[in-house]
Curated annotation (Swiss-Prot):
Known glycosylation sites: 31, 93, 141
Keywords (A to Z) from UniProt: Cleavage on pair of basic residues, Coiled coil, Disulfide bond, Fusion of virus membrane with host cell membrane, Fusion of virus membrane with host membrane, Glycoprotein, Host cell membrane, Host membrane, Host-virus interaction, Lipoprotein, Membrane, Palmitate, Transmembrane, Transmembrane helix, Viral attachment to host cell, Viral envelope protein, Viral penetration into host cytoplasm, Virion, Virus entry into host cell
Protein name: Envelope glycoprotein gp95
Keyword Transmembrane helix: yes
Residues forming coiled coils: 75-125, 143-173
Source organism of this protein record: Rous sarcoma virus subgroup A (strain Schmidt-Ruppin)
Homology family: Belongs to the Alpharetroviruses envelope glycoprotein family.
Cleavage, annotated site positions: 41-42
Cytoplasmic domain ranges by topology: 214-246
GO biological process: fusion of virus membrane with host plasma membrane; symbiont entry into host cell; virion attachment to host cell
Lipid attachment points (S-palmitoyl cysteine): 205, 208
Amino acid sequence: IPSRPVGGPCYLGKLTMLAPKHTDILKVLVNSSRTGIRRKRSTSHLDDTCSDEVQLWGPTARIFASILAPGVAAAQALREIERLACWSVKQANLTTSLLGDLLDDVTSIRHAVLQNRAAIDFLLLAHGHGCEDVAGMCCFNLSDQSESIQKKFQLMKEHVNKIGVDSDLIGSWLRGLFGGIGEWAVHLLKGLLLGLVVILLLVVCLPCLLQMLCGNRRKMINNSISYHTEYKKLQKACGQPESRIV
């Protein structure tokens, strides 16, 4: 609440409810995605130790899990997606390694072919013959696609690196929300969020716990009172014959 609600630098002239349309929200999101700076996320690449054993559920298991335990079905789907990503990364790494070895072999074969052709030309000239004396020796075409292969090879490596694991989801969300903040600010905000979550849990759960404790205490008191009352009744019932005999 400002110190000067009427007049002054903190004057509240008119209060209105903010109720933007769905199209307005989409326009703002599109403009922010176009003009905003892309922040670096805390992702780590999948290593060779990840599990790539994909075991998909059958139709019966999927139906029963979706009806009886949707959370288990969602967790299973996420786990299989992670394993599929690991399998894709390993396959891409093997493919790039294989193509790299094949490229090295092709390069060495090219050098060997050029050396053999130079040796043949030298021997023909040494014996006084030209290329026209042997059919097909005057025209020699050896295509060179090494530059294109290297570019595509590099693109494959870059695509493999696009698959990663977000190791700090909250930190990435805070960096995207507040812009270019430092790591110390991210850790501070994470600590504040954790403290806020703990306080909210205490606020939500503490009344329930207190109510349960009060209910148990009230029940114990009522039980003790009822036991005491029954004891008095039994004592009175046992004391009446004795008084008659006296």
